[in-house]
Regions:
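Short, well-ordered beta-strand core segments
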Residues: 37-39, 147, 183-185
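P-loop NTPase motor core
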Residues: 93, 99-175
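Conserved GTP-binding G-domain of TRAFAC-class P-loop NTPases and closely related GTPase folds
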Residues: 154-248
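A general structural signal for short secondary-structure junctions and capping/turn motifs
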Residues: 9, 29-31, 85-86, 139-140, ...
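Glycine- and charge-rich intrinsically disordered segments
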Residues: 1-11, 15-21, 29, 224-248
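Conserved, well-folded catalytic cores of nucleic-acid-processing
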Residues: 68-72, 105, 150, 179, ...
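Conserved P-loop
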Residues: 2-96, 100-105
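Short, well-ordered coil/turn elements that cap or connect secondary structure elements
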Residues: 34, 52, 142, 177-178
Length: 248
């Protein structure tokens, strides 16, 4: 068990970012400007992005994602059991588009497939789904992969106000927000696209790195080509700086 003391130097670690917004705001296109992205496409929409990721995994069930070819598996080498990573080892960023399909559809169906009794016991089913999801994220983290989860925008009426949040069922959404370092809402202002990380009364957000509203550059510019990679760099640097400040 690693132990970190107050004066120890904390190094950069992989981060988890949730991006959500309405259709047409370029969520997938933005996510694939991260470093060396592998896109897990559950919406069959990778061809709508303005550029193609390094690798695209088209998925219609959990087994299309969690398998030896994509994730990896244990193999025996020289009489020892060792972990052999799959396609994830070729990329630095894993993009899941969308998180709702993976969690609410694929993982839900897989859990019931493994134990039919879970079909009538939602509490236990969500517990199993949560453990499978944590295992998936844990493998990606051990691969030093940054992770981006893409969600659609869900609007809910709260009194006279409309609140925006990632479109997932309650428990899945809670799980995503809990493990995320940043949760950003993509919208348009004055014809420009912007990511807002700071939580407000009218939107869900998470801003561990204290990032300001971030304008998304126009397609085809050098700034856009590395936009998500640059955001991830800022998040990692901010987390390390916060940790260093706490040690003083």
């Amino acid at each position: 068990m690693p132990i970190i003391r107050k004066n120890d130097v904390v190094t950069e670690r992989p981060v988890i970012i949730v991006l959500y917004g309405t259709p047409g705001t370029g969520k997938t296109s933005l996510a694939t400007t991260a470093n060396s992205p592998l896109l897990i496409d559950t919406d069959r929409g990778f061809d709508r992005a303005v550029q193609r990721p390094d690798i695209v995994v088209t998925a219609s069930r959990w087994e299309d994602i969690y398998n030896a070819e994509v994730i990896g598996s244990y193999v025996v080498e020289d009489g020892k059991q060792v972990w052999k990573p799959g396609l994830i080892s070729e990329c630095k960023t894993i993009v899941v588009d969308t998180a709702k399909a993976m969690l609410d559809d694929y993982l839900n169906a897989f859990a019931i497939q493994q134990d039919h009794k879970l079909g009538t016991n939602s509490l236990k089913r969500y517990g199993v789904m949560g453990e499978l999801f944590k295992q998936f994220v844990g493998i990606l983290r051990s691969n030093n992969s940054d992770i981006i989860f893409i969600c659609h925008d869900k609007e809910t009426q709260e009194g006279d106000n409309i609140k925006h949040s990632p479109d997932c069922t309650g428990q899945s959404k809670d799980l995503l927000i809990r493990i995320a370092d940043q949760v950003g809402y993509i919208c348009k202002e004055n014809g420009n696209r912007v990511i807002k990380f700071e939580p407000q009364d009218n939107r869900v957000g998470k801003n561990v790195a204290d990032l300001q509203d971030t304008w998304i550059p126009a397609y085809g510019t050098e700034e856009f080509d590395t936009c998500m990679a640059d955001i991830i760099k800022k998040v990692k640097k901010a987390i390390v700086n916060k940790s260093d400040a706490q040690a003083k």
